[in-house]
Design a protein with these regions (language model features):
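Oxidoreductase cofactor-interface core, primarily capturing Rossmann-like NAD(P)-dependent enzymes
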Residues: 2-33, 37-38, 48-51, 58-60, ...
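Cofactor-binding loops of NAD(P)H-dependent oxidoreductases
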Residues: 43-46
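Residue-level recognition of oxygen-bearing side chains
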Residues: 52, 130, 257, 261
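Redox-cofactor binding/interface segments in oxidoreductases and associated redox assembly factors
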Residues: 62-65, 89
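A hydrophobic C-terminal alpha-helical subdomain
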Residues: 212-270
Length: 270
């Protein structure tokens, strides 16, 4: 029986990976607090503390790993020593430019390189922006202020990422591949808000957030180099996240999920 460990198992993507692995063998759900996750054995551990998670890899065949942790090469070395045979890395589509001067691109590229050099079988997932980012609108009233309101993105349902990850974790045929994953169409924030409003039966309206206000607000929640990275992506034109690929339907044998489908599933969060 295959044993799979999902790191970041309580996150938007990690939780979907756990759900998609139902019936595929033993699933271990690693999170900082060891929060119980349906269908998995909970484990507590922080990936920023290599020693604290060293025992977690024992008896594990495959690992789902989000990019960006401080010592990814060290984590991978411990996995290899423990006998892990396959790693599926959650990266980003932004790496395609290979721009190491961009902080977001850089930490994902570093993680990708570490996985490729680890000696473990690997698959890299490079998704577009997540539909679940709309959950940030939940605490707001019927007027939503949104940065980069004029930038279309082919947003993807994390459930589709989870389904592809589950396949990569259990199917050696996807080893050695970097998979660009997107939703079925490129949409503007106002388009997505309109769909959400229809699903909720509310008259929701989007107000573009001025760049200076967006920069200040984002800067209160993340390091300045990451704020700069997003402005370089969406104002500097360094990353086109509107391109649609067929990877999800090609691998899953069904269409990629729409934002309406995502909204119907998550309507209760609003």
């Amino acid at each position: 029986m295959t044993t799979v460990l999902v790191a970041g198992a309580t996150g938007n993507v990690g939780g979907e990976v756990v759900r998609a692995l139902a019936g595929a063998g033993e699933v271990r759900a690693l999170s900082r607090r060891g929060t119980p996750v349906a269908g998995a054995v909970p484990l507590a551990g922080d990936l920023s503390d290599r020693a604290a998670v060293a025992d977690a890899w024992r008896g594990v065949d495959a690992v789902f790993l989000p990019a960006g942790h401080p010592d990814v090469p060290g984590l991978l070395a411990d996995m290899r020593t423990a006998g892990v045979r396959r790693v599926v890395l959650l990266s980003t589509g932004a790496v395609v430019r290979g721009d190491v001067d961009n902080a977001v691109t850089r930490f994902n590229l570093v993680s990708e390189a570490a996985v490729r050099d680890s000696g473990i079988g690997w698959t890299v997932l490079r998704p577009s922006g997540f539909m679940s980012n709309a959950l940030q609108w939940a605490p707001l009233a019927d007027v939503v202020r949104e940065p980069f309101a004029d930038v279309p993105v082919a947003v993807i349902d994390p459930a589709d990422i989870g389904a592809v990850a589950a396949r990569a974790l259990t199917d050696p045929g996807l080893e050695g591949q970097s998979l660009r994953l997107t939703g079925p169409e490129a949409t503007l924030p106002a388009d997505r808000l309109a769909v959400l409003g229809e699903v909720l039966g509310r008259d929701l309206r989007l107000e573009p957030e001025p760049d200076d206000e967006a920069r200040a607000r984002l800067g209160s929640a993340m390091p300045a180099e990451y704020v700069d990275a997003f402005f370089r992506f969406f104002r500097g034109g360094e990353y086109d996240d509107s391109r649609v690929t067929t990877t999800v339907p090609d691998l899953l044998g069904r269409p990629a999920r729409t934002f309406r489908q995502w909204s119907e599933v998550h309507a209760g969060a609003f």
